[in-house]
Structures are given as C-alpha cells and as structure tokens.
Amino acid sequence: MSRAYQANPALNAARANLRATDEDVNRFQAGYRPNAALSADIGVQQFQGSIAGSQLSGRRGLTVPSGAGLTINQNVFDGFQTDNRVRSAESTVLGTREGLRLTEMNTLFNAAQAYMNVLSDTATLELQRNNVEVLEEQLRQTRDRFNVGEVTRTDVAQAEARLAGARSQVSAAEAALRASIGIFRQIVGVEPRQLAPGRPLDRYVPTSLDQAILIGLKEHPQILSSLHAVDVAELQVKIAEGALYPQAQVTGAVQQRYDQQFPGDNGVTASIVGRVNIPLYQGGGEYAAIRQAKENVGRARLVADQDRDTIRASIVRTWGNLEASKAQVIASQAQVQANEVALNGVREEARVGQRTTLDVLNAQQELLSARVALIRAQRDRVVNSYDVVQAVGRLTVRFTSLPVTPYSAREHLDQVRDLWFGVRTPDGR
C-alpha cells in the first residue's frame, strides 16, 4: 500500500489536478493587484507652420512624432466580485482536496484488494496442483486394482475423468493468478514478491454500525466535497450579483512625447483619473445569470443529500459484508475439518470394499471445494474490513499510519498563493 501511495498514476494525477486548482486562488487574487503596461509609438506627420513669430511660420514639412508611456490601472471596487471569486477558488481547492482524499482511499483499497487477490489465487493454485497430484496417485492405485480384478473399467474411467477436470482447474487457476498479478502491477507499480499474509484492519473498524454511519456522514470526503461545492455555488450567486454594483477604478499615466506637432514640440504629461461606472441596464443577461446561479445552488444541495444517502447505503452494505465474511470463515473452517474426517473414513471403507472409487473421488472433491471456499472466505474477511474503513472515510495514510511520508495538500497553495511574478512551478518546471 505504501508503494501504491507513492507511485500510483491515478493518485499522482489527482495530486497534479489539485496543484493546478491551487493556481486559481492566485489567478483571482490578481483582481486586487494593479495592472501596469508600457507603450511606445512612432509615426510620420505633415505639418504647416502657422505660429506668428516662429521660424516655422509659412513652412511645410514632415515631422516624426514619437513617444513612450506608462499606464497603471488599480481596481478600487468591483461589487465584491474579486472577494467572492477568491473565496470561491478557495472553496474549490478544499473540495478538490477532498477529491484527492477520495482517490487516495480508492487507491489504497484497490491495492489491498489486489494484494489479497494475489495471495488467495496463489493459495488456490497450490490446492489445485496438489489435487492433481492426489488424483494422479488415485488413478495409479485404481489401475493397479483394476489389473488384479478388484475394480471395473468404470472406476478407472471415473478416476481419469476427475484427473482431467483437475488439470483444467489448474489451468484456470493459473490464468486467474496471472490476471491478479497484472492488476497488482497496474495499481502498485511492481510485481508481487514474497507477499506476507494479509491481516484484517479491525482496529480501525468502528465498534458498531450506528457509529460507522455517524463517522461516515461526518468525515467521508465525498460528502465534504459536495458541501464545498454548495459553498462554491452560493458564492457564484454573489459573483453574479456583483455585476449590478457600481465599478470603480483609478488610472495613472505618464507619457513622454517628441516632435508631436512639429520638430522640437516635446513634452511630458502625467495624469491620475478615477472612474466610476454605474450599470443601469445591460439587456437582462445579468439577471438571468443570477437566477441560473441560484438554481445551481439548489442542485448542489440536492447532490449533497444524494451523496449522504449513497454513503449511508455503502456503509450498511460493507458492514453486512464484513459480518457475513466473519461467519463464513468460521463455517468454512468447520466444513474443512468435517470433510477431512469424511475423506479419511471413505478411504478406509474403500479399502475393505464398502465404498466405491466414485465415493472416494467425491469426498476428495468436497474437501477441495471446502478448502477453496475457506481461502475465499479468508480473503473476503480481510478485504471487507478495508472496505468498511474506506466506506466511513478513514482509509488514508494519515489515519492508518502507513510507513510513508504523507503528501501535503496545503504546501503547494502556500507556495503560490501570493506570487506576483514567475512562470516556474515550485518544483522548478
């Protein structure tokens, strides 16, 4: 799980998406900052001298007017739109963080599931291979007994049929194991090697179903992400309403002009201008935008309610699966023990002629099926414990204390929030 946390492509893509979303905060904070621009121009102009007493009087000629200037615009008031855009971006970041936490939980659960699938498929393959060896010995003994007249050709055929079926089961088990290894490689990034036995995550499972539901409704990232989406939708209403407010800005400009009207006509101008724009009517589009934003708030709240119901149902389902798998392990263990006793008894009875070869083959098959079922039940027992912890929103590196450095979702935003200049990312790209 630690390796999957560090190297899983889907999880790393979600982290990159969060970093990109962080930049929206800085992008909208630009509305607080001044805009500055330099300009320069040059041209050709014909002039007619007409200034009394001037050497230019009565003369015609060409002048080359040119100049350069600096203009600075500062937003003073925009109907609180910049404030609300920044707050909306911050809420979007918080929602994206919860989305990252959801991806983290899914990745860790998928890694645990893939781990247990490899273990269970490996154990199943070993059982199927051992079964082939047992049936090969059974067929040899049956043929020996047939040669001395103790059994019929039918018994030999039955043993051969069971052996052929067992070999096909080995092939199926090998294919299943290869598929599980492929999924493990996809999620974790490496081939499975010397896997230790899996253990349930019981110490992180809530003590009761009611407690699990309370925790899930409070902490699950899908619900928290939906609540942040409601905040974003409400702020979009305020942003749309800001279009009805007056807009105010201050512009400062400095210009140096050369040969403006005639050669030698040079000068410097400077100005500071305040402007206020009061919207009266803009075709009604801004009112439609406000109504639309309010409808989006209602939709976001309904989605949040839907997510609560979804998480509640998921917790109930996973809790039931965990309880069922616990009982299944106990029942499968008892079934294996009973089938082992039954097989030993059938073999003893077959030696004295009270049981047929088919009885022995059936007893062996029942024991094999019970052992495979026990492996599956043990696998489900572990996976379902992880599923419950995931369903309540706690299958994370920080909560389960995995031996890996947790990814800091806040660090990048702190690095870029107040950057005024620069095109390089904090990691140097």
Where is each model-derived feature located?
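Bacterial Sec-pathway N-terminal export signals of envelope proteins
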Residues: 1-41, 47, 75, 192-230, ...
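Amphipathic alpha-helical coiled-coil segments and their boundaries
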Residues: 7, 14, 75, 82, ...
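Small/polar (Gly/Ser/Thr/Ala-rich) solvent-exposed segments
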Residues: 12, 35-62, 73-102, 224, ...
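Heptad-repeat amphipathic alpha-helical coiled-coil interaction surface used
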Residues: 18-20, 25-27, 86-88, 93, ...
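Outer-membrane beta-barrel architecture
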Residues: 26, 71, 236-239, 275-277
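Acidic, low-complexity, intrinsically disordered peripheral segments
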Residues: 46, 375-429
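Membrane-embedded beta-strand positions in outer-membrane beta-barrel channels/transporters
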Residues: 69-71, 115, 273-275, 319
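Periplasmic alpha-helical coiled-coil/stalk elements that build and connect Gram-negative outer-membrane
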Residues: 102-215, 318-321, 325, 345-348, ...
